[in-house]
A protein has these predicted regions:
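Charged, gly/pro-rich active-site loop segments
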Residues: 1-21, 95-169
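Short, basic/aromatic recognition patches
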Residues: 10-38
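Structural motif corresponding to alpha-helix initiation and N-cap regions
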Residues: 24, 69-70
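Alpha-helix boundary recognition
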Residues: 31-32, 77-78, 120
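Short beta-strand segments
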Residues: 34-68, 74-76, 82-87, 95-99
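A short beta-turn/loop motif at secondary-structure boundaries
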Residues: 45-47, 90-92, 136-140
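Short, surface-exposed beta-strand-loop junctions and turns on beta-sheet-rich folds
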Residues: 70-72, 91, 162-163
Length: 169
C-alpha cells in the first residue's frame, strides 16, 4: 500500500529559530516502533478519558484492541473521534507524536488476521490475539479492533533544537 504523504508545516512560534519540520517518514517510523501509546476519548457526559494501550502501525493507520466492555469502547461507540499519542518523558532527546482521527471498528477477516500477525510480531504475550478472540466473530470474541487513520498529526521534537510540526492529510 502506498503511504499517504501529508502536507507538513513547521509551527515557528513553538520551534527553535533553526528548526526544520520533522519529515513524515520519521514520524511514521516512530509510530511504527513505539511500544506504548495513550488513547484519549470523550465520555458520554463530556469528560475526557485517557488510557495507555499497545498499538500497531499498518496501512497508514494505527490499530488497537480493547475489550468490548471497556470504557474506551463505550466512549468510541458514542463519539468515534479520538487522539492517540506516543513519545517519552525525557526533555533532552525525544520525538512526541499526536494523531487525531476517527476510530473505525474493524470486522474484515483478512484485515483482522493481519492485525493479529502484526501484534504477534511486535509484542510478546499477553498482547497476542487470535482472530476468533475478536468480537466481530461471535459470542466468544471479547475484543474489538479499531483503526485510526490520521486526519491531523503533530510531531514535537526536543534536543539540540525544539520543533513543532503539523501534518495535514
Amino acid at each position: 500500500m502506498t503511504a499517504k504523504e501529508p502536507v507538513a508545516g513547521l509551527d515557528q512560534p513553538f520551534s527553535s529559530d533553526d528548526a526544520t519540520a520533522t519529515p513524515w517518514a520519521d514520524a511514521r517510523q516512530q509510530l511504527d516502533k513505539a511500544e506504548v501509546y495513550w488513547l484519549s476519548t470523550v465520555r458520554p457526559d463530556g469528560r475526557p478519558h485517557v488510557t495507555p494501550l499497545v498499538s500497531v502501525w499498518m496501512d497508514d493507520s494505527l490499530y488497537f484492541v480493547t475489550g468490548n466492555s471497556e470504557r474506551k469502547a463505550d466512549n468510541l461507540a458514542q463519539n468515534s473521534y479520538c487522539i492517540i499519542t506516543t513519545g517519552c518523558n525525557r526533555l533532552s532527546e525525544a520525538l512526541d507524536l499526536v494523531v487525531e482521527g476517527d476510530a473505525a471498528m474493524v470486522s474484515d477477516h483478512a484485515v483482522l488476521k493481519r492485525v493479529s500477525e502484526r501484534f504477534g510480531a511486535k509484542y510478546d504475550s499477553p498482547f497476542r490475539f487470535k482472530v476468533p478472540d475478536f468480537a466481530a466473530y461471535g459470542e466468544g470474541g471479547k475484543n474489538l479492533v479499531y483503526q485510526v487513520a490520521p486526519k491531523r498529526a503533530f510531531a514535537y521534537g526536543r534536543g539540540a533544537q525544539y520543533s513543532a510540526t503539523r501534518y495535514r492529510f
